[in-house]
């Protein structure tokens, strides 16, 4: 994990920051204030965008960033070097690891397990194992930007629903962790955390993309078209026509996309 380029991660980061649920974040982080030592583990870290968001809000926390892409972690390490100039004792550790196997040692000594835009890619069994490991470590959980299946395109176009439905079918195919949770990720995370003894909060964290996100919109639209065509190659002409119409709206400065996500937080109140 991660399988995404540094350029893509940089492009989406402002939309991610704007989308996140401040309520879910504040609820989880406030439960950790005063806890020492305090270490967070971020899974599928990429270039460290999740830590750029969280560290100023939890300035006494050390971080372990975990990804299978050493090049992205190198970008993260350099970008995060002076993240908290007031907190000179903050330690940023990076670890190259295969998240598919989710070695329990990755969570050693952690009080918080985080990830961003990860859970919709993983399987139910993988998520259940993560919840068990987090509980056994005594760690709270904060999982941001889980895709939930909602796509609203404006102005509306013929075949918006067709493409959305194909995208959502594609979302549950194997992304390297077994059959992916896709749009069910947030709901299943909420249920599994609650069953494991966590107090859980979940709230929308939708991408709202306007003219200022033109390049992000373009890449999202083209990505949807690619996924839809993979599942329904016989519908390729319709999907291509839809793509051209959506890009025309984008070129005219009138395109607006809402892409549904949710954030899930878990505060551990019982040890099983």
What name fits each language-model region?
Residues 1-35, 47:
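Class I SAM-dependent methyltransferase Rossmann-like catalytic core
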Residues 44:
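Conserved S-adenosyl-L-methionine
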Residues 48-52:
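Glycine-rich SAM-binding Motif I of class I
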Residues 54-101:
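Class I SAM-dependent methyltransferase SAM/SAH-binding core
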Residues 114:
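A conserved beta-strand element that flanks and buttresses the S-adenosyl-L-methionine
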Residues 121-134:
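A short, conserved alpha-helix within the catalytic core of class I
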Residues 139-204:
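Conserved catalytic/acceptor-binding region of the Class I
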Residues 201-252:
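C-terminal helical/coil "lid" or tail adjacent to the Rossmann-like core of SAM-dependent
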């Amino acid at each position: 994990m991660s399988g995404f380029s540094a350029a893509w991660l940089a492009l989406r980061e402002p939309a991610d920051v704007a989308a996140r649920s401040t309520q879910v974040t504040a609820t989880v982080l406030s439960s950790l204030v005063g806890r020492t030592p305090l270490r967070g583990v971020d899974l599928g870290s990429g270039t460290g965008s999740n830590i750029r968001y969280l560290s100023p809000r939890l300035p006494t926390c050390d971080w372990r960033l975990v990804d299978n892409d050493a090049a992205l972690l190198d970008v993260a390490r350099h970008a995060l070097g002076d993240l908290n100039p007031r907190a000179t004792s903050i330690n940023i550790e990076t670890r190259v690891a295969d998240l598919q196997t989710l070695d329990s040692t990755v969570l050693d000594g952690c009080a918080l397990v985080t990830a961003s835009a990860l859970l919709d890619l993983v399987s139910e069994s993988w998520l259940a194992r993560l919840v068990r490991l987090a509980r056994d470590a005594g760690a709270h959980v904060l999982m941001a930007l889980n895709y939930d299946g909602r796509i609203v395109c404006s102005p509306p176009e013929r075949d918006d629903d067709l493409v959305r439905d194909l995208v959502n079918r594609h979302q549950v195919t194997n992304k390297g962790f077994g059959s992916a949770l896709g749009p069910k990720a947030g709901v299943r995370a909420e249920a599994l955390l609650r069953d494991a003894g966590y107090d859980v909060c979940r709230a929308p964290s939708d991408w709202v993309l306007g003219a200022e996100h033109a390049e992000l919109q373009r890449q999202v639209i083209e990505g949807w078209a690619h996924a839809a065509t993979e599942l329904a190659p016989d519908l390729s002409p319709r999907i291509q026509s839809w793509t051209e119409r959506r890009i025309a709206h984008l070129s005219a400065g009138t395109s607006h996309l809402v892409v549904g996500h949710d954030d899930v937080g878990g505060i551990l109140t019982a040890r099983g």
